[in-house]
Amino acid sequence: MIKRVFQLAALGLFASAAHAAAPIDNSALDKAEFREHKATYGVVYRLPQDVNAILDAKVNGTLKADLLKLGLKTEAETPNMPHVTVVHIHSADPETPARMLKALPKPPAPLQVTLKNFYPTEAAKGAGHPWWLDLGVVKSGQGFEDMMRYNTVATAALAPLRDGPLPRVTGPVYAKMAEAGRDLVKTMGVSGVNVMQDGKEVRAHNPHTTLVYSMAMYDARLQDAMKQEADKFNAVLPEGINTTFKDVSIVEIGFAGNVVREIYRVSLEDGSAIDVASGKKVGS
């Protein structure tokens, strides 16, 4: 019964969001180059200040210095609001964030999670770029399960608002993707999200926070360097970082996934929402 209600809710959200969206154009998937990036928006959990303080004290300074030594100046200076992503969509329509807020499913209660395990990863192995250095979320506990369930309903509700696939999963990345990833890009505009298939939840979401965003070619030198960085920081934070996410934000995102602007913030405690620029409450 619960599964049936969950499925119907996702389908209803999908239909209501799709009604407000522009047509979805997948023609970029037939091209060898990346799709031109107009604007990407997303739903993310901000990292709490206590987590940022630990990362600033134990990771970020050393990491920035190491990036500069490697010649990765752009990566060392990339602006970002530290976060864990729920879902990203591409849309050139500036009204998209407001539509996302309207379509956003009820968020979960505050999420108790553990951030643990630094690792480098590529958008698609062998594509060359983009690539990232991430810090994962421990895949157990109520907080993780709630995150996964919310990814499923949020993806169903918001993916119809896209105008096509995320540029970073097109071109050389799409060409190197496995079939399961390609199917998600075709149907949801992005890989790495959860969907309902035949009444069952199919999970591909891997929640994490990203410390390095790069479009440099991921050659053997950088692969080795990023493995060393991950090993170094795993030794510094072997137990990870326990924290609680208390809000979820609608944000604007750069090509590689970094947050460049927070637009709306929704409390996980009472569901209230604010316009970040004005500080005023929005919605009911």
Q: Which positions does each model-derived feature cover?
A:
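Bacterial N-terminal signal peptides that target proteins for export
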Residues: 1-7
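Basic, often amphipathic N-terminal segments
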Residues: 21-128, 137-246, 252-284
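Bacterial N-terminal signal peptides
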Residues: 8-17
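N-terminal targeting/docking segments
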Residues: 1, 19-22
